[in-house]
Structures are given as C-alpha cells and as structure tokens.
C-alpha cells in the first residue's frame, strides 16, 4: 500500500529502533526527515525500510540538540527498560498502585533508579526547547507515568515552554479504525501529546469497535474505575469499555484481531516428548512447561494453543467474555507467562505484550503432553503481532537482534492512530 504524506508535516523520530513509530507516522501521512538510535543494527535495518530520511547512530544524551533539523513534529519514546513490567521490578515509593490484568500487584526484582529513563526523557525537553516543535508525541509503559517521581515536573517543563498536553492510555489491540488494523496483541501503553499554545489538542478519545447485545455495533467509551487517579493502567483492571448509549452503558469487549491470524500454521514444531531442540543431548522440557501444556489440554481440548513463557496472570476462559480477552478467529492457543504462574488464552484472542526475549511458543495438542508439538513463535510472527507489514525487513544479524527490535518497537497501528489525530490539528 502506498501512503501519501503531506510534505509540510515532517517529523524527527528519536529512539527510532526498528521503526514501528516511523512506519505508523508514515501511514498517517507524515514525512520522516531524521531518525536516531544508539543501536547500529536497528538503524541499519531502519534504513533498509525507510531509505528516504536521514539516519544517525548516536547516543541522544551526548548529542547536540541544535544539530537536529527543525521539523513540525517530534516523536520520542524514552528508554523504559528500567521500569517495564517485562523486566520485573518492585514498585517504588510514591506511586499509584498498578495491577496486572488479573488484578494482582506487579512485582519482581527491585531496580534502583530511573537513571536512563530520566535522562532520555529530559532529552526530549532539551530538543523541544531548541526547536519548538508544533507537536511532540511520547510513548512509554504505564510505570513511566505512574512511578517516576519527576513526571509531573517533566510535564511542567513543557508547560513553561508554552505547550498544552493530553495523556491517553490504551492497548494496541484496541487502537485502529478503517484500514488501520489493530495489533493482535494486548500491549498497554501510555501516550502523551504536547501541542504548542494556539494549536488545538487532538481528539485522543479511545473508541474501539464493539458489539453491544442490545444496541448492536457501537464505538465503545473508555470508562475509568477510579477517575480520581491518573488515568493509566490496564484494560479490565483500571478501566473498561462501555456502550455509549446513555440508556444502556453495558461493559463491552472491543472487537480485536486474533493472534491466530498471523501465525504460520505450516511451520512444524518439535514433539515435546523428544526433548528440547536447542540442546545437543536429550534434555526434557521443564516440569513447569509440561504442566502449562497439560493445563491447556485440560481447558481447550485438542485445539492448537500458544504458551507464553513469561509473567504471571490467571487463566482466561474461552467460554465467555472475561477481562483482557476477546473471542474471534478459527484457532485456539495457550498463552502462559514466564515465571511462577501461568495463564491460558486462545488464538481467539490477541497476544499478550511482545517483549525483547522469546516468550511465546506454539503448541499443537495431542492426547498426551509428550505427543504435542511445540515451537517458539518466530520473529516474523512477533513482528506481525506488532502490526508491522509482512514485507517489513527485519535485522539480518541474528534472531536475538530481530526479537530485540520487535519487542522494543512501538506498535505500528498505535503510532498511526496518534499521527492521524495530530495531523488533523496541524492542518
């Protein structure tokens, strides 16, 4: 598909990585002028996909912001590895409680400070002070908005520079409309859009398509369970979607894309009873992995399912609507987080968050665990879960570099959703 862009609406993409944000903004009709990242592998791959803009391999902390070009828009996603729930860390003092989709506190090993997060966030202010962009767009994990003690001070810095701001939180599975397909992945992220005084704030109301049993097809409204707290968190825990009809107001599940749509069902897996294929001599799968596969068999019979070897959530049933899942598609999957606890989901649902390490494995069931086949989802499948197009070039260096780039990327549909709305107020 060819996307037409307005030559006047150009943008700079700091921390561009593999290019999810760049691709999304291009789809929104914006033009990239310069992109930057510290990782030469990701920048080289970005250049292959987007050859018509300038590429820099630089550490933004040490880069003279005066050397950046003057563009109308700046996109910046501050480094979030210190605070991402995928890294697993204990919460810091002074925060608002954040729960996972099961309502359980996010816990893990403590990380001492927000050092890199703070530094890269301040780089965005520094660039804005020099170039006075018409709009600045930032994306990060909810913890950036909830846990960082300087977050309100950071917002205040933009206010001093003459900017208004608007914050929105949503899952990548719920952002999209028209030909902007949603991502088949539950990826909760916060976004903040700054516009210069005199430029209207964009309409960032999240209104995903849903089916109301009484009212039919609707655009659901995002409703926060505790409106007195900062509107940031996870769907089904901190907020819901309701029917917009005043006389109805039912809690609805947005229409989503199933992960089964992007799985290569022709790729063969390894029989579990034959042991792990990544070992030279026979090594059985861990007991916890076998137990998760058995749980999937018990819940979903003999349909294919995906095991997610990562974080803790609780079991999700395919029998009816439950928080953080949706039901559509032709296949089933078991998705179980890596760690102490696991959860089961189906390919009727979107994938959970794609991280920077391989966590998702496809299981083809059989009557016994040993006879099931298992394989990790490929980088291409994970890229599709981030809504990259099928022909998007991935790093050639290694599978690890591919997964790193995909896991760090902004979901393409989310960047496009924001870009379209910002473009509307800059017209």
Where are the predicted features?
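Conserved active-site and SAM-binding loop architecture
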Residues: 1-427
């Amino acid at each position: 598909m060819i996307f037409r862009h307005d030559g006047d609406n150009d943008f700079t993409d700091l921390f561009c990585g593999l290019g999810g944000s760049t691709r999304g903004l291009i789809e929104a009709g914006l033009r990239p002028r310069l992109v930057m990242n510290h990782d030469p592998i990701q920048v080289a791959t970005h250049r292959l996909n987007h050859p018509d803009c300038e590429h820099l391999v630089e550490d933004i902390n040490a880069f003279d912001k005066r050397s950046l070009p003057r563009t109308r828009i700046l996109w910046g996603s501050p480094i979030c590895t210190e605070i991402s729930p995928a890294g697993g860390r204990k919460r810091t003092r002074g925060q608002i409680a954040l729960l996972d989709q099961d309502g359980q506190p996010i816990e893990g090993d403590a990380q001492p400070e927000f050092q890199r997060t703070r530094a890269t966030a301040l780089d965005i202010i520094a660039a804005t002070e020099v170039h006075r962009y018409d709009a600045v767009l930032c994306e990060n994990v909810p913890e950036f908005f909830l846990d960082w003690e300087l977050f309100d001070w950071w917002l205040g810095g933009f206010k001093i520079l003459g900017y208004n701001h608007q914050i929105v939180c949503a899952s990548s599975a719920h952002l999209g409309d028209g030909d902007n397909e949603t991502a088949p992945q539950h990826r909760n992220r916060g976004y903040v859009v700054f516009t210069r005084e005199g430029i209207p704030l964009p309409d960032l109301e999240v209104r995903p398509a849903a089916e109301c049993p009484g009212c039919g097809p609707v655009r659901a409204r995002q409703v926060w369970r505790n409106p007195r707290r900062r509107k940031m968190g996870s769907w089904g825990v901190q907020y819901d979607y309701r029917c917009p009809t005043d006389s109805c107001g039912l809690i609805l599940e947005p229409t989503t894309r199933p992960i089964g749509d992007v799985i290569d069902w022709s790729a063969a897996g390894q029989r579990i009873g034959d042991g792990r294929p990544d070992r030279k001599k026979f090594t059985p799968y861990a007991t916890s992995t076998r137990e998760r596969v058995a749980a999937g068999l018990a819940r979903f019979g003999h349909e294919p399912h995906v095991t997610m070897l990562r974080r803790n959530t609780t079991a999700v049933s395919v029998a009816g609507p439950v928080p953080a899942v949706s039901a559509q598609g032709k296949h089933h999957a078991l998705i179980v987080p890596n760690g102490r606890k696991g959860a089961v989901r189906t390919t009727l649902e979107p994938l959970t968050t794609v991280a920077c390490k391989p966590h998702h494995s496809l299981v083809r069931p059989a009557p016994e665990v040993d006879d099931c086949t298992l394989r990790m989802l490929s980088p291409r499948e994970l890229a599709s879960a981030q809504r990259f197009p099928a022909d998007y070039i991935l790093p050639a260096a290694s599978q690890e570099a591919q997964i790193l780039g995909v896991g760090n990327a902004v979901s393409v549909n989310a960047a496009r959703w924001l870009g379209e709305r910002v473009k509307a107020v800059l017209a």
